[in-house]
Amino acid sequence: MATRSAKIDQKADLIWAIADKLTGVYKPHEYGDVILPLTVIRRFDCILSDTKDAVLQKYDEVKNLPMKDILLRKASKKDFYNTSKYTFERLMDDPDHIEENFREYLNKFSANVRDILEKFKFDGHITTMANKGILYIVLKEYTTDRGNLHYETQRIFL
């Protein structure tokens, strides 16, 4: 098991790797406008990974019911969920449609998460990265080992 210091170094390496991909498209003082929301989204993605299949199955059963939000939260065992078939890893399977698929993924989060994401004003950055051809490679960084932001990584912040 990696030490706390090694985990911190790994996450710092992730941020620098993403910053390298943003060079030429964004100014250094703008990197955080991309890295912070993506890191939050990836963290949500990792947290939901254990119950993803259960949520998708439950969604098929309850998508037309008025109480679906409550039932999907129960299925995810969290106060939020995502009903997209995509995860960060699954998004990598279709690089030609990355912008469309990533937007669909984001739109399938529960309303409380979508509200958080809207406050980042991130939508324009998706367009910019897609138009500049870096959206796929930036998202791909989050699927590497250093991009794993699952539960055990929360200890680096303690």
Residue ranges of model-derived segments:
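Non-catalytic, mostly N-terminal accessory regions of nucleic-acid modification and defense proteins
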Residues: 1-158
